């Protein structure tokens, strides 16, 4: 393991780049980390060296070629020394069977022989199927489609969580009934969508659609719905507390998804802020996966969910296994009135 490009790249035949692709304050794609990594790799290649560069970061179609080509123009390296390929990162932290060694991969490059070689490489890493596609751009687009579709699917069930209770219907019962149909895609509603992929990648899709004169409808709508869930959920907690802001509330879970310690883009933070804006008093947060969370000053991170008297409501924000396995009879003793959201 090294952070020294200069000592490692010259001896390599292949470089895999997997860095974050965030958005800026205006929700526009920020390729800074990708460009910086590519420049560092290209800049470390010997004058007579050759290298295949595989990008794994989520990007728009055309980005791999564009960023590498631009880097080569400003370097001592000729175009003939570098081959380009793309294989999007796929992993689902916290879920068994979806690790790097399990999931299928998609490989596209500028050369059929290189595509075959890289496919064989990834097939040694994963037990999943490795799909070779016709171009870098097809592979890039596939990753955007995966995550944009998931955001849309989750937005629909979140919308159902808003609608169905108004009809006097239980959301879980309706979804479970619908799931008896063989081609129904089952998702669960929540207080929002978090992580470094699903809330971010759709903006890359929206941007490239708009840049090509396509009026994207579903992805922007999905982003609006999913981004609204922390506010909606906070208002539902107030409603559950007889229309009064809770004086004391216990939130279980802070990370963006169950069984991980990653709190990037967690919807729990805007949910907490919405509670505070709605006049909530003391807020306690318990998450067995996170030692220190970047919480507002008025929020207390606790190491034990039990023994806190006078709690108005318990919120299951992130359903860790440890949360599900809590002694709910004991936890109930902390509540003034049995209220669990």
Predicted feature descriptions by range:
Residues 1-341:
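Structural/interface elements that position substrates and couple domains in central-metabolism enzymes
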């Amino acid at each position: 393991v090294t952070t020294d490009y200069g000592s490692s790249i010259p001896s390599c035949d292949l470089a895999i780049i997997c860095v974050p692709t965030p958005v800026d304050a205006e929700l526009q794609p920020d390729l800074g980390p990708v460009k910086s990594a590519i420049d560092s790799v290209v800049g470390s290649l010997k004058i007579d060296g050759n290298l295949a560069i595989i990008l794994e970061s989520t990007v728009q179609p055309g980005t791999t070629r564009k960023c590498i080509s631009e880097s080569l123009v400003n370097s001592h390296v000729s175009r003939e020394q570098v081959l380009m390929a793309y294989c999007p990162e796929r992993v689902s932290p916290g879920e068994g069977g979806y690790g790097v060694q399990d999931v299928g991969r998609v490989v596209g490059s500028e050369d059929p022989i290189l595509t075959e070689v890289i496919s064989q490489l990834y097939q040694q890493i994963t037990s999943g199927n490795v799909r070779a596609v016709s171009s870098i751009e097809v592979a890039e687009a596939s990753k955007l489609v995966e995550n944009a579709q998931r955001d849309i699917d989750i937005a629909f069930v979140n919308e159902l969580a808003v609608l169905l209770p108004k009809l006097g219907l239980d959301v879980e019962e309706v979804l479970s009934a619908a799931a008896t149909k063989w081609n129904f895609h089952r998702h669960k509603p929540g207080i929002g969508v978090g992580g470094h992929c699903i809330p971010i990648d759709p903006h890359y899709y929206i941007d490239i659609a708009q840049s090509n004169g396509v009026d994207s409808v579903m992805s922007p709508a999905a982003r609006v719905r999913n981004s609204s869930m922390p506010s909606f959920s906070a208002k539902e907690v107030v409603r559950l507390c007889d229309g009064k802001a809770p004086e004391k509330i216990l939130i279980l879970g802070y990370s963006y998804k169950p069984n991980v310690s990653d709190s990037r883009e967690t919807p729990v933070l805007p949910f907490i802020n919405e509670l505070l804006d709605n006049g909530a008093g003391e807020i306690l947060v318990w998450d067995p996966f996170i030692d220190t969370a970047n919480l507002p000053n008025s929020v207390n991170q606790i190491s034990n969910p039990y023994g806190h008297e006078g709690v108005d409501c318990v919120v299951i924000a992130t359903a860790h296994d440890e949360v599900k396995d809590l002694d709910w009879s004991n936890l109930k003793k902390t509540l003034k009135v049995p209220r669990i959201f």
